[in-house]
Amino acid sequence: MEDSSEIKVETASSRTSWIQSSVAAGGKRISRALGYITGEMKECAEGLKDKSPVFQFLDWVLRGTSQVMFVNNPLSGILIVIGLFVQNPWWAIAGCLGTVMSTLTALILSQDRSAIASGLHGYNGVLVGLLIAVFSDKGDYYWWLLLPVIVMSMSCPILSSALGTIFSKWDLPVFTLPFNIAVTLYLAATGHYNLFFPTTLLQPVSSVPNITWSEIQVPLLLRAIPVGIGQVYGCDNPWTGGIFLIALFISSPLICLHAAIGSTMGMLAALTIATPFDSIYFGLCGFNSTLACIAVGGMFYVITWQTHLLAVACALFAAYVGAALTNVLSVFGLPTCTWPFCISALIFLLLTTNNPAIYKLPLSKVTYPEANRTYYLTQERNRRSSTITKYQAYDVS
């Protein structure tokens, strides 16, 4: 009887260990599978190196499409393109053409191949194509509009290279400055009364807006969060914004989180200065804050609770800068584009502090927030171990 009970105990324990090992193995397989589609999808890029150049170019274009939101992931790029078609197929066509021409121009100019492969010469092009279509007063499918889309998107790698030469002295990214310069020049050169390429008429506010606080609609305020994220690409469809959030979450949950926080901060900041409700509902107060919050919240700074608060502050700052520039540029009939984001993010990245928890990453080491933190923690462990070894050697001597 004792032997049989011992056998039963051994059988139960072996079965438990087998279940535990199976669960652990299954968890590793799931983690490995998720690793293929999350983050930067390095395995995809490596696997395409010996494939047709067409597939490689498509990968670069998709990464460029998602790099607008600091995401280097072709799957996210596919979802973003789908979101653009949900918003407006004509805008999507113009945006895709802008990315293709911008990436192709970078190849012709022999720009850094790794930067091209990461989509860093495509994201300004997609924004140029989209915003030229968005601000066109000719309506959809005005095919002649593709001419300025091609020309202005081809100027983006030139502007990126020139600005990169200057900004590299401070180890700063160029962000969307090439897009801002290209689109602002185009809109200033054409205008509403242009014969070939008329643009939407933008005018400054000439009267006090009629704001009744009791009429504010909370559901529309909540909807403004995904809409504000969609407005990064000039889209006001909440479904498109939701698709963009999914695209961000696939690559980096931290980017997704800070995008939502940034859009929310932009909305709240707009309420504090009595911005007309329609502008808030359409997400026009949230997109610059979205980008600013992502940039500081783990992208170029290692994510800590201190940099998280700094990201929130940067989002609020970008919202107020955006309100100021909207009033100034509307006098000239120009939109703010993402000038407020660029100004705010660059100011916060030039911040100097003795707080070790606010650590700005070298530009060459920036990937995505989760990997950035892993890199930082590894560097810290290596530094501490080398310091301990040095002190031990000193004690021995």
UniProtKB/Swiss-Prot annotation:
Ranges that cross the membrane: 68-85, 92-109, 115-135, 143-163, 172-192, 239-257, 264-280, 287-303, 309-329, 331-351
Superkingdom in the source lineage: Eukaryota
Localisation: Apical cell membrane; Basolateral cell membrane
Tissue-by-tissue expression: Kidney.
Glycosylation, residue list: N210
InterPro entries to which the protein is assigned, alphabetical: Ammonium/urea_transptr (IPR029020), Urea_transporter (IPR004937)
Gene3D superfamilies (alphabetical): Ammonium transporter AmtB like domains
Catalytic activity: urea(in) = urea(out)
Membrane topology: Multi-pass membrane protein
Predominant cellular place of this UniProt entry's protein: membrane
Molecular-function annotations in GO: urea transmembrane transporter activity
Cited Pfam families: UT
Cystine crosslinks: none
Reported regulation of activity: Inhibited by urea analogs and phloretin.
One GO cellular component, as annotated: basolateral plasma membrane
Keywords of this entry: Cell membrane, Glycoprotein, Membrane, Transmembrane, Transmembrane helix, Transport
Annotated coiled-coil segments of the chain: none
PANTHER family referenced in this protein's UniProt entry, alphabetically: UREA TRANSPORTER, UREA TRANSPORTER 2
Function recorded in the entry: Mediates the transport of urea driven by a concentration gradient across the cell membrane of the renal inner medullary collecting duct which is critical to the urinary concentrating mechanism.
Family, similarity comment: Belongs to the urea transporter family.
Protein's name according to its UniProt entry: Urea transporter 2
Organism: Oryctolagus cuniculus (Rabbit)
